Regions:
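Acidic donor-binding segment of Leloir-type glycosyltransferases
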Residues: 1-31
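Active-site-adjacent helix/loop segment of glycosyltransferases
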Residues: 173-211
Length: 211
């Protein structure tokens, strides 16, 4: 099943989806409830064993979903997995949002494989082996639905940014693991909803780091 959550958009998004993809379940929110709120609302209507949270500004390689499903099927101790995420405008480089999996430094600040601050690494196969990570990118992450519900989903205090870090952290407190599965591949535009280097994006990033 495919569920599209519309966070109070004012363009023709909902109309276009209805016209082009009649099989898609559309949930329309009157207001923008943020990434966390939107995902939680969508998850409440989902029936699957696994939940795939996916940004709307992505393109995908063939079979990538099956590869994530197969990994979760064969790793029952894993809560969440993410694909390799490359930049859609320059497909030889990792994407800003998640690259090949995230970690926290000794001060609690996040970083990812594939990016050093704002500098993106070229993908030369250096992260092509599946590996355990601390957090999976919210741009594309597949999770176990029962554990997601047990964790009460995303914490909606995080309107945008770092909600996936909090979720993965809480899952690990229950002894579940988080993995990067790089043979599953997607491409991400990035910063299409909240533009980079705006006051709002800086505020949310820094506030959420401290939360």
């Amino acid at each position: 099943e495919i569920i599209a959550v519309d966070n109070g958009s004012t363009d023709d998004s909902v109309h276009n989806i209805k016209q082009l993809f009649s099989e898609v379940v559309i949930i329309s929110n009157q207001n923008n409830v943020g990434y966390s709120g939107g995902c939680n609302i969508g998850a409440q209507s989902a029936q699957g064993k696994y939940l795939l949270f996916l940004n709307n500004d992505t393109e995908h390689s063939k079979g990538w979903i099956e590869k994530l499903v197969n990994f979760l099927d064969s790793h029952p101790d894993t809560f969440a997995v993410q694909p390799k995420i490359l930049n859609i405008k320059n497909r030889e480089y990792f994407d800003y949002a998640g690259g090949s999996g995230g970690f926290l430094d000794h001060y609690g600040f996040p970083y990812v494989k594939g990016r050093i601050f704002n500098t993106l690494e070229k993908d030369t196969g250096q992260y092509d082996k599946a590996s355990e990570i601390f957090w999976s990118s919210g741009a594309a992450m597949m999770v176990r639905g029962d554990i997601f519900n047990q964790l009460n989903g995303f914490d909606e205090v995080y309107f945008a940014y770092m909600e996936e870090i909090d979720l993965c952290w809480r899952a690990q407190s229950l002894q579940y693991k988080i993995w990067s599965v790089p043979d599953a591949l997607i491409y991400h535009y990035g910063k299409q909803t909240i533009k980079q280097n705006t006051i709002k994006s800086h505020y949310l990033n820094h506030r959420n780091s401290w939360i």
